[in-house]
Amino acid sequence: MKFSEMPYKRIDMEEVEKEYKSIIERTKNAKSGEEQFEIHREYYKFTADVQTSMELAMIRHDIDTTDEFYEKESDFYDEVGPIISQYENEYGKVLYDSPYRDYLESKLSLIHI
């Protein structure tokens, strides 16, 4: 698929925050490393979708800075980007402090915060 054909949809920040909170809470309450790893797989897919939307908007704005639609989208992501970063940092801390960290690192790699 060509870049120009990639569909763009603005994220629903309310839904994004709800999903981050759910993932973080479920990770904290996981009863095993396997359970945390499965939640991490969900997290990875979820954040990839969020990041794709953000990147599409930013790149399309950079390609044509006169496009008002993508200028507004870029402004939106400039606003919500720090909020998303806070959730990602919080999730990273939960993994770092996990009692199953050794298991997760055997599946993923070293966990840094």
Model-derived segments and their meaning:
Residues 28-37, 93-95:
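Charged, low-complexity interaction regions
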Residues 9-20:
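Short amphipathic alpha-helical heptad-repeat segments
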Residues 64-76, 89-108:
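Long amphipathic alpha-helical coiled-coil segments
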Residues 111-113:
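Conserved small/polar residues in nucleotide/adenosyl-binding loops
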Residues 45-62, 76-95:
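Amphipathic alpha-helical coiled-coil segments
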Residues 33-45, 70-71:
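Short, charged, amphipathic alpha-helical segments
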